[in-house]
């Protein structure tokens, strides 16, 4: 029962409780329950492989709700391009999307970086009340940094 992985998860649960971070608490609790109920490796692999896409889908649904309810319309879209903040937001959205795409690919080819990214994200969630949306984008930033290092060499 108290394997290294379970102790690691319990540590993250404790950190989530200390930081009062419900997202981290729920995520760790779900993973602990999956382990306690002996969910097989294939199911865990599927969740690991598809979980980010599921999360992105849920976030996208939440973002689209104001459009569906009429809170945001075409006028708002047009008005957003009349300000510097609107253009900066557009550029930031494009940049983050590209970084996330590169990050997913980089995490697949360099699993070593994944451990550091996950730990860094957990630390940011606990210490700075960050949001755990960072690993994919962080991997994209790491990818770009590694490309720069390779270019300089």
From Swiss-Prot:
Coiled coil: none
Subcellular locations according to the entry: Cell membrane
Alphabetical UniProt keywords: Cell membrane, Membrane, Transmembrane, Transmembrane helix
GO CC terms in record: plasma membrane
Membrane-spanning segments: 6-26, 54-74, 80-100, 117-137
Membrane topology, from the record: Multi-pass membrane protein
HAMAP family: UPF0756
Family, per entry: Belongs to the UPF0756 family.
Descriptive protein name: UPF0756 membrane protein LMHCC_1001
Originating organism: Listeria monocytogenes serotype 4a (strain HCC23)
């Amino acid at each position: 029962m108290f394997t290294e992985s379970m102790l690691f998860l319990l540590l993250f649960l404790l950190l989530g409780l200390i930081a009062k971070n419900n997202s981290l608490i729920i995520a760790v609790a779900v993973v602990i329950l999956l382990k306690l109920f002996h969910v097989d490796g294939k199911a865990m692999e599927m969740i690991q492989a598809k979980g980010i896409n599921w999360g992105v889908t849920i976030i996208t649904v939440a973002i689209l709700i104001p459009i569906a309810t009429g809170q945001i319309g075409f006028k708002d879209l047009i008005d957003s391009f009349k300000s510097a903040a609107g253009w900066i937001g557009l550029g930031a959205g494009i940049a983050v999307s590209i970084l996330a795409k590169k990050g997913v690919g980089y995490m697949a080819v360099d699993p070593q970086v994944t451990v550091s990214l996950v730990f860094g994200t957990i630390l940011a969630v606990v210490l700075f009340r960050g949001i755990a949306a960072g690993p994919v984008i962080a991997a994209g930033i790491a990818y770009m940094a590694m490309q720069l290092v390779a270019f300089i060499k």
